[in-house]
Amino acid sequence: MEISEKQIEKYLVKKIKAEKGLCLKFESPGYTGVPDRIIILKNKPVAFVELKRPVGGRYSARQKLVERDFNRLGQKVYKVKNKEEVDKLVEELI
């Protein structure tokens, strides 16, 4: 059975909370295409995460543009589409 984006998101939140961090939903009225989550861990850089379902999850043109804007400002947008990628991301961030 295919895992949903929502299930991946819940897993990410759980993993970050286990590290005593915050995994905040990122919504920006008036500025579309922002990443889904902001991760804040003690004494670590802030991380922005875009989640997609494993099969058929596609990034919109607007999301790609926003990612370029973030990169231009020295910020990385992490993209994850399954639990294994969440695990790798958490290991990288901690």
Where are these regions (language model features)?
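Catalytic phosphate/metal-binding cores of nucleic-acid and nucleotide-processing enzymes, i.e., regions
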Residues: 1-94
